[in-house]
Curated annotation (Swiss-Prot):
InterPro entries: Class_I_gatase-like (IPR029062), CTP_synthase (IPR004468), CTP_synthase_N (IPR017456), GATASE (IPR017926), GATase1_CTP_Synthase (IPR033828), P-loop_NTPase (IPR027417). Mg(2+) binds at D71, E139. Allosterically activated by GTP, when glutamine is the substrate; GTP has no effect on the reaction when ammonia is the substrate. The allosteric effector GTP functions by stabilizing the protein conformation that binds the tetrahedral intermediate(s) formed during glutamine hydrolysis. Inhibited by the product CTP, via allosteric rather than competitive inhibition. This is CTP synthase. It comes from Azoarcus sp. (strain BH72). Residues 290-543 form the Glutamine amidotransferase type-1 domain. It comes from the Bacteria. It catalyses: UTP + L-glutamine + ATP + H2O = CTP + L-glutamate + ADP + phosphate + 2 H(+); L-glutamine + H2O = L-glutamate + NH4(+); UTP + NH4(+) + ATP = CTP + ADP + phosphate + 2 H(+). HAMAP family: PyrG. CTP binds at S13, D146, I147, E148, K186, T187, K188, P189, T190, Q191, K222. GO terms for biological process: 'de novo' CTP biosynthetic process; pyrimidine nucleobase biosynthetic process. The keyword Magnesium applies. The keyword Protein biosynthesis does not apply.
Amino acid sequence: MTKYVFVTGGVVSSLGKGIAAASLGAILESRGIKVTHLKLDPYINVDPGTMSPFQHGEVFVTEDGAETDLDLGHYERFTSAKMSKRNNFTTGQIYEAVIKKERRGEYLGKTVQVIPHITDEIKSYVKRGAEGADVAIVEVGGTVGDIESLPFLEAIRQMGIEEGRNATCFIHLTLLPYIPTAGELKTKPTQHSVKELREIGIQPDILLCRADRSIPADERRKIALFCNVMPEAVIECLDADSIYKIPGQLHDQMLDEIVCHKLGILARAADLSVWENLIRALENPKQAVDIAFVGKYVDLTESYKSLIEALNHAGMHTESKVNIHYLDSEEIERSGCAVLEKMDAILVPGGFGKRGTEGKIAAIRYARENKVPYLGICLGMQLAVVEFARDVAGMAEAHSTEFERETPFPVIGLITEWADRSGKVEKRSEDSDLGGTMRLGGQVCKLADGTLAREVYGSGEIMERHRHRYEVNNTLLAQLEEKGLVVSGRAPVTDLCEMVELPADVHPWFVGCQFHPEFTSNPRKGHPLFTAYVKAAIARHSASRG
């Protein structure tokens, strides 16, 4: 029978519930417990796919093509569990499902209400997502006290009763602010947050207290007394310079032992040696490289969460410190590429919209002409093709139809037809809805023999995750290949271009991929493409300093 750990948050948002939940999952998994994670988002959007990165941050794509919250990326990076459409749902999805049932007559003429119909639907979604796991760690988005979260909190309250006390554990993450004028951490916000939770009918079993300094013993006892939890269940979550230190931090305070005791689980001792080794690699690099990250949302790095982590993973696996320099592509448009001169490698990530594209193209041209290692992801690959078409193949006005509908050389165009993972043909047009209509999820890619891509992956066939509407235009691809562009990866059914590169005698390391390899990178194994990219940056750094 699956047991449940519910994680809620109070006082303020952005305290790190996702990291806390993922870290707990990592510790429990190290004890031989099969875990899964769910994220319950209280917004009315059906999914975050059409939300602005400034509003939501990164959209994480699962193997089965779900556009989900970035916390699912943390879950996959910290544990071996693979997330799917069942692991993230929103108020919008719940209401949509209930309304469809009402239209079909499944409620037999009853008045459809938040309680019981919405809460019952939430519970059924939670149980479906938790199937097959020993422990499901369920994170409830938002902050206790928000109106939007109430149906979710009521649903998990009911599950606490229905599943039984030994099958549920409630963890509440809260904030202990330090007031310099008073010279102490303040517990009152935590007390009020727990009071609010208890008024809903949920008594937390464990408190995770975010703080910038250690919590004195007398303050812990005070929190325990007034929040009705055991003193050992008041656990401090101190600010850390790496999220990968959090599992060890929580294990040292016996969080996993308290959870296992509450759930009646007998399990072997935790083994966090993998995490300890990763931290050692992170803190003892043998060299450093400087990577130019040329993007549009560089003031909000949460928009590129998985990509930043993938670069950090590559650093761990190459014993190097990766210094990421976030460069606004619009600033490059205005001021030129001088800022790139001291960089060991250049990366252009995915993105949408015309703003800043010419700055990205200028950075790509600089990488190609100066033989700087280059990695282009999604839009970064498309713009690499545009730059090659313009500056090498003689197609001076080449562009993507996403940005210039009337371009005479549409080297990038809308994908109108492709095969999904099951082989089903998907079709789209310019008039299709924005939400859920991209080429999404895991897709097979065939790699050409003798290419850098084939060497990097060590395999002729790979599976990577996609999120895009536009692709390289096959009708113009042959002309680009004649001029020296190497198509190193193709989709086996539709022949869509998935990877491009430059020959080794032209450039030491220049790769573009239509997919998002960052979604499958994790700290334990890294990802071959990012590891090879950082190695190329190290080689350039050594040669330039040589």
